[in-house]
Amino acid sequence: RLIQVKFPELIKQVVPILSPAEAAAIYIKEELVKRGEYSPEQVGIWFVAPCPAKGSNIRQAVDVNSTAITGAFSISKIYGELCRVLKEDASFSDWQDHVTTGSSYGMGWGAAGGEAKAAGIDNALIVHGVDEAYEVLEQISMNKMHDVDYVECSACYGGCIGGPLTAVNKFVAEKNLQQRV
């Protein structure tokens, strides 16, 4: 969104790639419709967002004309209650075996540098923080950055896992992510 508003001349340089959340939403929606369980209009997919930027990106994305994601809400709003329900609900264990974990690339996407790592880009500049991202985008806009193949900007320090709507401290989130990836 920052690029759309402040640096529209850079939009053509934004890589048109689906986020793991969007790719998963498309897949899930297609699978449910293909099985004949639901019509496309009956499928609602909600993104559990770590930050306002990710939530607003659903409807204002540069790289997609439409989205399979219905809407978004904050992980911090549901985390405690969700954990309580999952621990107490015996039926959760019945379908827990059917739950799959995403790839390490998809899981790592939300950390600073996760996009570049997933894409296999070595010569990348990883920027996190709104002011820092603005400064780098300004330099790119003025054609002052030539020795970088890819720039990954995150509004939040540490990437999305450091977002203000996350359920745990960003340092704890980073440690947890490193253990899973």
Give a label for each model feature.
Residues 1-181:
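Iron-sulfur-associated redox domains of electron-transfer enzymes in respiratory
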